[in-house]
């Protein structure tokens, strides 16, 4: 991220962990036999903590999403959106046809809403809820204008049980309307 958001005047460069640390696992946790040891004294900026209730594993906050799901199409909803969603992110969550770590556990196939919170230590956390489900496998979200968003689906089965007779993907329109 430092190549996108450079440190401000007088700030030290930030290190987000790669390749020494992934998510919220400590740098000493070697994910792979070839994972290098972190240089001594290197401080990492931890990722955003996902407080859930959606997208977490084992009921615990995590710095990622569930196993076997992937975030897609991150969109900020600012002015022009109803108060319930204004100043939040929406992110597609592409499901996998591999079950999660729990028995009969599926993840993804939805759009998540992420409400950001600044924590006392200056880090960020997100309250993540399922916003739109079930979907096929959302692969992108495209804001067209304030109050209008398109969601692109890859295919339309919404769980691992409906593998037969897949329908082609589709484009969904999400439109904010005024209350009467």
Regions found by a protein language model. Give the residues of each.
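Conserved catalytic network of the ASCE P-loop NTPase/AAA+ motor domain
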Residues: 143
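Beta-propeller and closely related beta-sheet repeat lectin domains
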Residues: 72, 139-140
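Beta-propeller domain segments
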Residues: 1-129, 146, 158-180
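Residue position within the beta-strands of beta-propeller blades
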Residues: 91, 150-153
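Conserved loop/turn at the beginning of each blade in beta-propeller domains
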Residues: 67, 134-135
